[in-house]
Amino acid sequence: VFVNKKLIFRYSKNNPIYCYKLPNNKVKVYRPKAQKSNYKWLSNATNNELQGFSQLTQETEMLVITKSMKDVMCLRSFDIEAIAPQAETNHINYETLQLLNQQYRKIVILYDNDGAGIKGAQELYKTLPNAKIIYIPKQTKCKDISEYVSMYGVENGKKLLTKLI
């Protein structure tokens, strides 16, 4: 992977690299084994670009706002409309939130159950007071839905979401 024409890291068995292609010729690179301070995530997307937004079908009454593309993909596999900002600390602009609020009868906020996720969900709720905030229960030892599905399976993931929503 290059940043400003300089090679900053290479793929290896011990350093896997995943690249998500986003709309408008944007990409997001993820290195799951990297330390947070050492380019764990790289992207040329702006804070205003929502992951999963271009895949919304607008054929359901519910939208889940989650924290990552991985969670969006997991929710979409359950036929649940989902989007995510570039990070939990990024704010979705007010106009977009109002548009989504008009389009969907029910909006659910499903961020990580850690400090950053809880804070991010509470901030988002200030702009979407009719939304429902849910978290993956901490006793599951999972911070998000994709981790839960990985640990407990697809069917249990669906059951948990049905119960929480």
Predicted regions located by residue number:
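Phosphate-handling DNA/RNA-contact segment within nucleic-acid enzymes
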Residues: 2-103, 121
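TOPRIM fold recognition
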Residues: 60-63, 69-165
